[in-house]
């Protein structure tokens, strides 16, 4: 994939994350600045999601540590855990929020 395709795919993934947070009704603030999305929780803890263009990866940093995601068979997959990005975002949001979130 070239850089343009990478950015289009990451933009689509970030949009899914934003819409899911909005639809969940959870008390999560998010801000996108350049290549970085910051999710902030009531206790002021944060999850940082950013795109790494040179490696065509998405990186996620949270209380649980740092994770790198590569596009594998049309899914952003963690090189450490094998978990899909959106599943990791949901799991980490619930850890940071300290409660289950309705992602319906």
UniProtKB/Swiss-Prot annotation:
Q: Which organism is it from?
A: Vibrio parahaemolyticus serotype O3:K6 (strain RIMD 2210633)
UniProt keywords (A-Z) are: Iron, Metal-binding
The entry lists its GO molecular-function terms as: ferric iron binding; ferrous iron binding
Q: Which InterPro entries match?
A: CyaY, Frataxin/CyaY, Frataxin/CyaY_sf, Frataxin_CS
Q: Does the keyword Iron apply?
A: yes
Q: Which CDD domains match?
A: Frataxin
Q: Which PANTHER family did the record assign?
A: FRATAXIN (PTHR16821), FRATAXIN, MITOCHONDRIAL (PTHR16821:SF2)
Under SUPFAM superfamilies, the record lists: Frataxin/Nqo15-like
The free-text function statement in the UniProt record for this protein reads:
Involved in iron-sulfur (Fe-S) cluster assembly. May act as a regulator of Fe-S biogenesis.
What's the family? Belongs to the frataxin family.
Pfam families according to UniProt: Frataxin_Cyay (PF01491)
Protein's UniProt name? Iron-sulfur cluster assembly protein CyaY
GO process annotations (BP): iron-sulfur cluster assembly
* Record PROSITE patterns: FRATAXIN_1, FRATAXIN_2
GO CC terms of this entry: cytosol
